[in-house]
Regions:
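A short, solvent-exposed beta-strand micro-motif common in secreted/extracellular proteins
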Residues: 602-613
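Membrane-embedded alpha-helical bundles of multi-pass integral membrane proteins
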Residues: 20, 30-38, 42-61, 72-90, ...
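Short extracytoplasmic
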Residues: 317, 530-570
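Hydrophobic membrane-insertion alpha-helices, especially the h-region
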Residues: 497-515
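Short Pro-Gly-centered beta-turn/loop motif in secreted/extracellular proteins
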Residues: 592-604
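Iron-sulfur-associated redox domains of electron-transfer enzymes in respiratory
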Residues: 138, 149, 360-486
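Iron-sulfur cluster-binding cysteine motifs and their immediate structural context
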Residues: 310-361
Length: 649
């Protein structure tokens, strides 16, 4: 037996793509390779986004944008069978969108496809924008979860100079005069960010030829049916309205959108900013952190190019354009876009394209081998049957195999040809183009003069040396004929099981979308002092000349007095808290926001607000009873300190 000759150029490639296919083949057996959800992660993500948008438009028809009536309108919607079903579809499609984006991101990392910088960065941005869409959407319900969202968001931004911490207190107090503006911003952001996402998706696939925007039609049906089932079986419910209590003690928590907010429970605000910015930067620069040498680009001999346009049409990454060169139309390759897949070699009947990693094929007459094996660079080292005389070539992608070369091999030096391919092509289209060429559906066609049944394609998860041996021993019909290529792949799925498994997967995500999380301890006594205060002026700025008749009657305030907030125990008058607040503005001449949030062990406290420059001007409220759970709010109303109720009065 002649030893197998392996022609391999370049370095070994990542094992991540191989591992992912071995994991995903379970779903191929049920769905088929074409409909495998793991091979359509991006398409399913776009589909879920489209479903969320369509259902969101419908839900918006019945939504009252006034925050005082928002919860009631959502509740009325939920109490209607069809409207409630549409709301559930909107909610679950949004949650699943995050899940599939994350799986898509992990798949990209695992298979080292993040080197395409534009696609990677736009993907990261789209994930962040989707999170913003979800958070603003939850705000619009204006239930206890919305109140908690507003409070945590305001608390996070309070560390920035242009935001004040008192906004967090306004959310807790349900002060719609203050937070009503933020409510409108949330509504505006929810709509605008959705439109921005469409642009980001376009950028994401900008440099990809023939992108799969949506999954195959049957898979679309499976997703919609599964989504409909869980929306009917598990209708979405709101938390109690925001006005129901001051502190959102116990709220449902959607981990898919709120995972970042949980860090507010564990770390300080500044630490959360470091985590937020740091993780965003690290994700964005992963293509630079993890070095992976790309395949060299292909080379086109313009003297041989006959301008057939097939290479430009077949390139998965739009790296080839047909341009005028010295008055003649030629194929011009952009090396910055080329990933070195060499699929263009399989497109060129004129052998005008070469690649450093493509082997030198023996097509001339010689003693025939039993099987000639082509394996793609992402196919693991195959175990070959020792009893066969095998000629083996390793190519960058099976899409680089030219039908004309296979014809010459079958004619001159081999009995049969086996092609070992990825189940899901690393370069997207290589496997598809190869099959279609040998099925005579895509140029360059495999000639009808040759029997295509002498060629077999086996995917990574289908290959075994026993199958290769059986293929080599298969007899060919003596009647002749063009035959058809043998394809070892998962071609047929089970629609019923496909829908059931997808429904089960969708249902398993529901618990994480509505777990109960507490950011406030119901056993603690929380005191919150929150109000706007304009202190007395300490300096004035006089405009005009020194003449009395030139002076203005109401001079401008140049500076105002700071104030000091003190909190004492009503029992023993022990000082619990003291803080000085400065008026805002560059000249300290603008109103200030008084805000503090304390957990106090006392049963009652006294609150005293004193103007530093005018000690006689003082506001005092004694013997404020503190209660567990819902908290106690002290506000300034009608020029006196009072304890607010749940409605902010």
């Amino acid at each position: 037996m002649e030893n197998s000759r392996i022609v391999q150029k370049g370095k070994d490639l990542t094992k991540g793509h191989q591992w992912f296919q071995k994991f995903s083949t379970f779903f191929s057996r049920i769905y088929s390779t074409e409909l495998n959800p793991m091979y359509n992660l991006g398409g399913i993500s776009v589909l879920l986004f489209a479903i969320a948008c369509i259902s969101g438009i419908y839900v918006f028809i019945f939504y009252n944008i006034n925050p005082r009536h928002a919860w009631d309108s959502v509740e009325a919607m939920s109490n209607n069978v069809f409207n409630g079903w549409m709301r559930s579809i909107h909610r679950y499609s949004s949650d699943l969108l995050v899940i599939f984006i994350l799986i898509h991101l992990l798949h990209t990392l695992l298979t080292s496809k993040f080197k395409r910088l534009v696609s990677w960065v736009s993907g990261i941005i789209s994930f962040l924008v989707v999170i913003l869409i979800g958070v603003t959407g939850y705000m619009l319900v204006w239930d206890q979860k919305a109140k908690l969202t507003g409070y945590l968001t305001a608390k996070l931004f309070s560390s920035l100079p242009i935001f004040d911490a008192s906004i967090a207190g306004a959310f807790l107090l349900n002060d719609l005069d203050v937070v009503g503006g933020f409510f409108k911003v949330a509504l505006f952001g929810h709509i605008v960010f959705s439109l921005v996402t469409i642009i980001i998706i376009w950028v994401h696939v900008l440099r990809i030829s023939k992108p799969k925007i949506f999954p195959p039609k049957k898979l679309v049906y499976y997703v919609i049916i599964a989504l409909d089932i869980i929306a009917i079986a598990f209708p979405v419910k709101s938390d109690p309205p925001a006005q129901a209590s001051n502190l959102p003690i116990s709220t449902t928590f959607d981990w898919y959108y709120y995972f970042g907010y949980y860090l507010m429970k564990l770390f300080s605000v500044n630490t959360n900013w470091l985590i937020l910015i740091g993780s965003g930067v690290v994700l964005s620069i992963i293509p630079y952190l993890i070095k992976r040498k790309n395949n060299p680009p292909a080379f086109i001999d313009l003297d041989k190019c006959n301008a057939c346009n097939l290479c430009a049409y077949d390139c998965p990454y739009e790296a080839i354009d047909m341009l005028q060169v010295e008055g003649k139309r030629k194929a011009i390759l952009d090396p910055d876009k080329c990933v070195g897949c060499a699929i263009c070699i399989g497109s060129c009947d004129e052998h005008a394209i070469t690649h450093p990693m493509f082997p030198d094929l023996v097509v001339m007459p010689k003693p025939k081998s039993d099987v000639t094996v082509f394996s793609c660079s992402y196919f693991p080292e195959p175990e070959l049957p020792s009893e066969l005389n095998i000629q083996r070539y390793r190519v960058p992608c099976t899409g680089s195999i030219m039908p004309k070369d296979v014809q010459r091999m079958l004619e001159n030096n081999t009995e049969k040809v086996a092609i070992l391919s990825c189940e899901d092509c690393y370069y997207r289209l290589g496997k598809t183009w190869t099959i279609n060429r040998f099925l005579r559906k895509r140029a360059p066609l495999f000639s009808k003069k040759f029997d295509a049944s002498l060629v077999q394609l086996l995917t990574l998860t289908q290959y075994s040396k026993e199958k290769l041996l059986a293929f080599s021993k298969e007899t060919v019909s003596e009647e002749g004929g063009s035959g058809e290529i043998n394809i070892g792949d998962h071609k047929k799925g089970n629609p019923v099981w496909s829908v059931l498994i997808m429904t089960l997967f969708f249902a398993l995500m529901i618990p994480l979308s509505s777990t109960t999380v507490r950011f406030f301890n119901p056993a603690e006594k929380t005191l919150i002092v929150n109000f706007k205060y304009i202190s007395s002026p300490t300096e004035y700025e006089q405009f005009g000349s020194g003449a009395a008749h030139m002076q203005v009657k109401n001079p401008a305030v140049k500076r105002r007095s700071p104030v000091t907030l003190k909190i004492f125990s009503s029992k023993d008058k022990k000082l619990i808290f003291e803080k000085e607040y400065e008026p805002r503005g560059l000249r300290h001449d603008i109103a200030m926001f008084i805000f503090t949030q304390l957990v106090v062990d006392e049963d009652a406290v006294d609150v005293v607000l004193t103007e530093t420059a005018f000690p006689d001007k003082q506001y005092k409220l004694d013997n404020i009873k503190l209660k567990q759970g819902d908290g106690t709010f002290v506000i300034l109303r009608d020029d006196k300190l009072i304890v607010a109720d749940k409605q902010g009065f």
